[in-house]
Amino acid sequence: MTEKSSNDPINKTATLRLAQTDMCKGYANGSIGIIVSGLIWLISATISYQYSAKQAVWTLLIGGMFIHPMGMLLSKVIGLSGTHTKGNPLGNLAMEGTIFMIMCLPLAFGLSLQHAEWFFQGMLLIIGGRYLTFASIYGLKLYWILGAVLGVAAYLLFYFKVQSFGSLLTGSAIEISFGLLMFFSFRRDNLNG
């Protein structure tokens, strides 16, 4: 009988890849959450257009609390688990990223007290930075591109003094586009694999 001793090397690459595969299968590469987030940005854009930027700030903040539960629900509707295996260490990384993002919200809200549109541009930077960690969580380098696109968009929107409605539409379009790309990539890979 051969048992592994604590001195035997662990194949960390294989272990990480298994954890990433588990995350990908549970959340369709994270695509469902991105699409839900993009739809919340679109709803906020509508609120900004119909009512005010201040109400759109609250719509995005409150709506953002429902991204994960709505993503889980939609994942289950399309036949996915909508969750990851208990004990998957990447679940902890996802939670830590969420907590960091929540800790950044007061900064974005403070920006809105100066200029309402700065809130949305700040949020694009915050979520763009958060998506960078998703490259490790899901093992998909496309998240680096998503994070960079959101970050560059935030800077350009700020530089060109784009108002709230335009910033919200930009965030929505970027997230929905990337979310759909990731979803169809997930479907292709899982229908063929």
Residue ranges and their predicted role:
Residues S37-N92:
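Selected alpha-helical membrane-embedding segments in polytopic membrane proteins
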Residues A45-W58, A108-W118, F158-F165:
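Helix-coil boundary and interhelical linker segments in multi-pass alpha-helical membrane proteins
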